[in-house]
Amino acid sequence: MSRILDNEQMMDEEMVERTLRPQYLQEYIGQDKVKNQLKIFIEAAKLRDEALDHALLFGPPGLGKTTMAFVIANELGVNIKQTSGPVIEKAGDLVAILNDLEPGDVLFIDEIHRLPMAVEEVLYSAMEDFYIDIMIGSGDANRSVHLDLPPFTLIGATTRAGMLSNPLRARFGITGHMEYYEEADLTEIVERTAEIFEMDITHEAAKELALRSRGTPRIANRLLKRVRDYAQIMGNGLIDETITDQALSMLDVDHEGLDYVDQKILRTMIEMYGGGPVGLGTLSVNIAEERETVEDMYEPYLIQKGFIMRTRTGRVATRKAYEHLGYEYMEK
């Protein structure tokens, strides 16, 4: 069975997210710091009749970076064109996209840290001075062509801001750090989703689901669908606190939001390495997961919740991890 808390998007989930996606900042729940900053920057850009400065949105998967990009475009009243780093394989691909932009348009590049360097270098002049120089022809006929671009706003999204080159990062005038959601905001998101899809859910059930959704709206919405299934088959359709707890326990999602993979990480650290320190590569091999998957998807939440610590010599399981899994903790 696929991991219920996996943040990899599937086609049906993309359709669900489009249905749930807020259109404007006032509809966007959570991320208040980012929203308040953007509201000022957007209003100022509109008053000056200028394109908004380029913006970089970064943070763990599933926190609404794509949604925020579309909200920004709506607030500006402009079109948005969407692509992703892995799709743009060569400079010519990017040139074609840039050449199709209208004045003020938003270009959204997801996973921008995965742009090839040759493509990234084309962006430098495009972002800074709104032009690109490209080489056409070959051999003796090879020549440089200068193309002016309309003012536009590039919005980049990444889960790994540290992988962006310094020259690219420096060209973003706006940065927004998307953080894990507070329980109250996530509860509101769960209740909003339930209302849109006409699910019958109690406030206590929404709170319980929010508490166990790793501070991530995408996970909360995914779990809500599975709890709804459970309520329809094992109950009378009402999603209450008892049904929610039973459904999430069946899915191996505990009261801290940890699933079997998270628990496997912690148990491996404790049972095989005495709680650590253990290197990320070694840990990844032992749990049969890719290093990047552990680093991007599991580790941030485990650190944020205080279950593991990063040290110079490796990852270390904390007292909280021992106690949560029922192990005796001994000071080292």
UniProtKB/Swiss-Prot annotation:
Q: How does it assemble?
A: Homohexamer. Forms an RuvA(8)-RuvB(12)-Holliday junction (HJ) complex. HJ DNA is sandwiched between 2 RuvA tetramers; dsDNA enters through RuvA and exits via RuvB. An RuvB hexamer assembles on each DNA strand where it exits the tetramer. Each RuvB hexamer is contacted by two RuvA subunits (via domain III) on 2 adjacent RuvB subunits; this complex drives branch migration. In the full resolvosome a probable DNA-RuvA(4)-RuvB(12)-RuvC(2) complex forms which resolves the HJ.
Kindly indicate whether the keyword Cytoplasm belongs to this entry: yes
Tell me which UniProt keywords the record has, alphabetically.
Answer: ATP-binding, Cytoplasm, DNA damage, DNA recombination, DNA repair, DNA-binding, Hydrolase, Nucleotide-binding
Q: Name one GO molecular function term.
A: ATP binding
Compartments, record wording: Cytoplasm
Q: What is the protein named?
A: Holliday junction branch migration complex subunit RuvB
Annotated region (Large ATPase domain (RuvB-L)) at 1-181
